[in-house]
């Protein structure tokens, strides 16, 4: 499976977790995720983050948000 297919497969679960945790709409969750360092790393093939589980990636995102607060 290529990287973009892998990302497209797990992204919906990541976004659902963010939506549920932060009470956001899908668009808001997508914007928040891709505006974060975690989202940037997820989009970058060189980091390999796309190969991790949705739980791991959403956990990284939520930890990043806690640290920013």
Segments the model singles out, each with a brief description of its role:
Residues 1-69:
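C-terminal alpha-helical interaction appendages
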């Amino acid at each position: 499976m290529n990287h973009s297919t892998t990302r497209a497969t797990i992204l919906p679960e990541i976004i659902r977790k963010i939506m549920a945790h932060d009470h956001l709409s899908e668009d808001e969750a997508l914007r928040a995720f891709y505006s974060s360092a975690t989202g940037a790393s997820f989009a970058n093939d060189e980091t390999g983050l796309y190969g991790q589980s949705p739980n791991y990636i959403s956990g990284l995102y939520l930890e990043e948000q806690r640290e920013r607060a």
